[in-house]
């Protein structure tokens, strides 16, 4: 009987949480556009760890596709080798640089994690608009171009929000972890932009400062980035629905990641 009496309260709580998870809290724009100069390239950071064979050919193809869609804007790749044990070969790098000589290669000998790799690439970015995504370009090129347009319109940070197509590519374990992370982002960190783990984000110079100040080296660096940016009331953050490319494979996370990232989540909340 007591459980039945409590049921309406539980349903109301779930309704409130769902509304918070799905609302767009972005503020209207009141700033001038922050267009990159004609001589300035948009920087795209691409962290790599043990990339699949042919990764450099995919980058060359995607660069050509993106430049065509970006309508005259130039684009520079910043490729970060996070101490790969295989795949990131000298021949592959030479082929990439021959086709795209403006590409910057950042490499080091100790594996540090995706967060550290993105920050390493960020330290070499000089553009007023910078993005990062995975080396295998899981998102459609159109999503990347739309992100650039939102940043040019004045947003400080733009987040790729994963739609239903993303979750069809996930294993049951990853689905549970993704949904759980959104709930924890809201309940523990108070984030209204709860989908912080999508692998595509963009930012201007102001947004760059928040990413540069993160400390998490692995999975939850995205969450720390959005948490830091959301602490400033005048920072403009945009949630942008994004589509995955066809035939994208999203691997399972290794064992122990959940416990490690729960610890990082509490550290983010503790450090504030």
Task: Say what each PLM segment does.
Residues 28-32, 51-68:
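Short, well-formed alpha-helical segments that are part of the catalytic scaffolds
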């Amino acid at each position: 009987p007591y459980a039945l009496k409590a049921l309406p309260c539980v349903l109301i709580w779930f309704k409130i949480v769902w509304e918070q998870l799905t609302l767009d809290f972005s503020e209207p724009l009141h700033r001038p556009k922050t267009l990159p100069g004609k001589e300035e390239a948009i920087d795209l950071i691409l962290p790599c760890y043990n990339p699949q064979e042919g990764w450099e050919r995919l980058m060359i193809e995607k660069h050509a596709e993106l430049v065509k869609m970006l309508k005259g804007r130039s684009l520079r790749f910043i490729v970060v080798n996070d101490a790969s044990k295989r795949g990131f070969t000298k021949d592959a790098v030479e082929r990439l640089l021959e086709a795209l000589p403006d590409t910057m290669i950042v490499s080091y000998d100790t594996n540090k994690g995706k967060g550290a790799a993105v920050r390493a690439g960020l330290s070499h970015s000089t553009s007023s608009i910078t993005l990062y995504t995975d080396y295998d370009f899981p998102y459609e090129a159109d999503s990347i171009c739309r992100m650039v347009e939102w940043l040019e319109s004045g947003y400080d940070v733009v987040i790729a929000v994963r739609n239903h197509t993303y979750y069809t590519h996930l294993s049951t374990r990853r689905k549970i972890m993704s949904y759980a992370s959104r709930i924890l982002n809201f309940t523990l960190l108070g984030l209204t932009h709860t989908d912080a783990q999508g692998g595509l984000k963009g930012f201007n110079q102001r947004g760059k400062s928040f990413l540069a100040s993160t400390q998490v080296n692995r999975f939850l660096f995205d969450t720390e980035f959005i948490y830091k940016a959301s602490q400033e009331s005048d920072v403009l953050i945009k949630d942008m629905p994004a589509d995955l490319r066809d035939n994208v494979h999203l691997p399972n996370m290794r064992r122990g990641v959940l416990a490690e990232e729960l610890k990082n989540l509490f550290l983010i909340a503790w450090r504030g």
